[in-house]
Amino acid sequence: MAAKHVVFGAEARERMLRGVDTLANAVKVTLGPKGRNVVIEKSFGAPRSTKDGVTVAKEIELEDKFENMGAQMLREVASKANDTAGDGTTTATVLAQAIVREGMKRVAAGMNPMDLKRGISKAVAEVVSDLAHHSKKVKTNEEIAQVGTISANGETEIGQMIAEAMAKVGNEGVITVEEAKALETELDVVEGMQFDRGYISPYFITNPDKMIVELEDVLILLHESKLSSLQPLLPILESVVQSQKPLLIIAEDVDGEALATLVVNKLRGGLKIAAVKAPGFGDRRKAMLQDLAVLTGGQVISEDLGIKLENVGMEMLGKAKRVSIDKDNTTIVDGGGKKKEIEARVSQIRKQIDDTSSDYDREKLQERLAKLAGGVAVIKVGGATEVEVKERKDRVDDALNATRAAVEEGIVPGGGVALLRSSKNIDVVGLNDDEKAGIDIVRKALEAPIRQIAENAGVEGSVVVNTILNNKSRSYGFNAQTEEYGDLVAMGVIDPVKVVRSALQNAASIASLLITTEAGIAEAPKKESAGGGGMPGGMGGMGGMDF
């Protein structure tokens, strides 16, 4: 085992604090509408320019092992805030730095770190309940757009686009962000249920110009296994021909005699038909077929359930108003499923999301939920250069996460004002002087975000704080974008409660760990052995050779 280097007490805390300051100072320049960019060198390609706190934090590694420990613990604050609320990473970093610096001063003055930690926890709990008490629910499209605009650093176009996407696919719908190949940023909405399987044979195409299959008022056969033989299919095909409606077959695969017969009948015009492979694999395929059955009001034909294909009646087929299939995707619009059954299926998937511990499973379940509940919207972010597109995509991601958080837990006035107001409402009492000092640490730290926003805008932070506190209205604050004071909610400067809350809770959690640190252990640097690099001995007899 390699030797370790151990430092204690004040030295351990000081070196960690240096790391905390290095990371926080790099991250906090990005805070607020007048925040600056940070340029990050990449091992290949152009440097990356960003205003996203967590992206900056993830790039920082320091040479000194103990400074690096402090920086990595602070990086955890930004990552945690990003995971919980998807935004507020810079605010969390600024708060953590403020709590750590104040806390370290008190510990150096001889106060008990554990009592300070208890005081910090009490104050944070009080602030969280104060934020929840004063939050306002987001209802209108305008409010959703305002939240998105603020988080995208004042880009109205992005805020509007997110509001439009949420209006179209609902709060449960999936909204994804991709890089576009064009200059413009655009919104693409897919209604209904879409899955990533295209037509099995191009002979099914009904619209040769667009190379797609379009079917109206469709019957849908959902089969779990592979269809190769024609015989079991004949009874249901005859019934479908008599009904004069198109048929879509979704099965594990369709090949051989079955596929040949379907294609021939389609080309002769006797049968409007198309076949696609079922989405997913293994157990997930079964679950997705069941989703399709609920959505279309049909039944999955499965040998496990004892249902044979030759015994299938028309009542077991699903229905949909419209189906569109291209070579990669199938979209089913307006399925004939009962609303009650769809809602039951949605709540079942929601419960599975709550119960699962795997991020991958959660993501897949959320996709299924969105396909059942709303639809899918894609925001394609454009720009003149690759660097610009990446920077804008970061901001759109932040804005999208902030908007979702706002819909979930409501909003408070932005610009750091909510935390500043809450700092004056902390009325918990510490059990002793050290706990009281812990509460005071949080009171002072809650001023840090608004001071930083003001300073990034080139205004004196102390003046801004005093001006705001002299006004009694909770929503009165400083708009750094326009450098005006006024009602921030009316100006559209708002923050989601979830973002502010998780920023504070994560900052306090990691800051408390740093304050209560009494020793640090790191791997000792390896000493270079003297005399290295020489030729090994024992080759003396080769001196006369001429190379």
From Swiss-Prot:
A molecular function GO annotation: ATP binding
Q: Which cell locations does it reside in?
A: Cytoplasm
* Record: residues binding ATP: T30, L31, G32, P33, K51, D87, G88, T89, T90, T91, G415, D495
Q: Which GO terms describe its cellular component?
A: cytoplasm
Q: Where is the composition biased (Gly residues)?
A: 530-547
Extract the ranges annotated as region (Disordered): 526-547
Q: Into which EC class is this enzyme placed?
A: isomerase
List GO BP terms, alphabetically. protein refolding
Task: Enumerate the CDD domains for this protein.
Answer: GroEL
Enzyme Commission identifier(s): 5.6.1.7
For whether the record's keyword set contains Magnesium, the answer is no
Q: Which reaction does it catalyse?
A: ATP + H2O + a folded polypeptide = ADP + phosphate + an unfolded polypeptide
What is an example of a Pfam family matching this protein?
Cpn60_TCP1
Tell me the protein family, please.
Belongs to the chaperonin (HSP60) family.
Q: Which HAMAP family match?
A: CH60
What exactly does this protein do? Together with its co-chaperonin GroES, plays an essential role in assisting protein folding. The GroEL-GroES system forms a nano-cage that allows encapsulation of the non-native substrate proteins and provides a physical environment optimized to promote and accelerate protein folding.
- Please give the name of this protein: Chaperonin GroEL
Q: Which organism is this protein's natural source?
A: Hyphomonas neptunium (strain ATCC 15444)
Its taxonomic path starts at: Bacteria, Pseudomonadati, Pseudomonadota, Alphaproteobacteria, Hyphomonadales
